Swiss-Prot record:
This is SsrA-binding protein. InterPro entries: SmpB, SsrA-bd_prot, SsrA-bd_prot_CS. CDD domains: SmpB (cd09294). One of its GO terms (biological process) is trans-translation. It comes from Ruthia magnifica subsp. Calyptogena magnifica.
């Protein structure tokens, strides 16, 4: 009897990250949403030709849409297809999730930001975060904390080198 020696791929392949979102916002809760995409967009996502740093999510007519995400079309895209790289894309969520998001948005200073774009079970998913904006002193505090952690790790590494020879 032959054994099936297929390698199992990880179920989570990150396409794009929005690192600025965690710097500019306090992320309170995250959700996974599907995306309504066209064929050429999926091909571009397979080549990681996407930018979500300047994108944002908006609620319109009880539906969520992703604005400002730039998906670069491939050179091999058909000429008869109009490839708009920054078109608005609908997010696919349950009604219960949309209602929960709507309740959170109604709070002062609350917003929805895209955090990462990834493959899950062969489909493109977008992780969105319900967030509140940080003030400049909060950002400075985070930078100080990161610097302190980095310096602490550096000194631990140096002391380990001295004692371990």
């Amino acid at each position: 009897m032959a054994k099936n020696n297929k390698k199992i791929k990880t179920s989570l392949n990150i396409i794009a990250l929005n690192k600025k979102a965690r710097h500019n916002y306090f992320i309170e809760q995250t959700l996974e949403a599907g995306l309504s995409l066209e064929g050429w967009e999926v091909k571009s996502l397979r080549d990681s030709k996407v930018q979500i740093k300047e994108s944002y999510v908006i609620l319109k007519n009880n539906e969520l849409f992703l604005f400002g995400a730039h998906i670069s079309p491939l050179k091999s895209v058909s000429t008869h297809v109009n490839s708009d790289s920054t078109r608005t894309r609908k997010l696919l969520l349950n009604r219960l999730e949309i209602n929960r998001i709507k309740d959170n948005i109604n709070q002062k200073g609350a917003t929805i930001v895209p955090l990462k774009l990834y493959w899950a079970r062969g489909k493109v998913k977008l992780e969105i975060g319900m967030a509140k904006g940080k003030k400049s002193h909060d950002k400075r505090q985070d930078i100080k904390l990161k610097d302190w952690q980095r310096d602490k790790q550096r000194t631990l590494k140096e002391t380990n080198k001295i004692f371990n020879f």
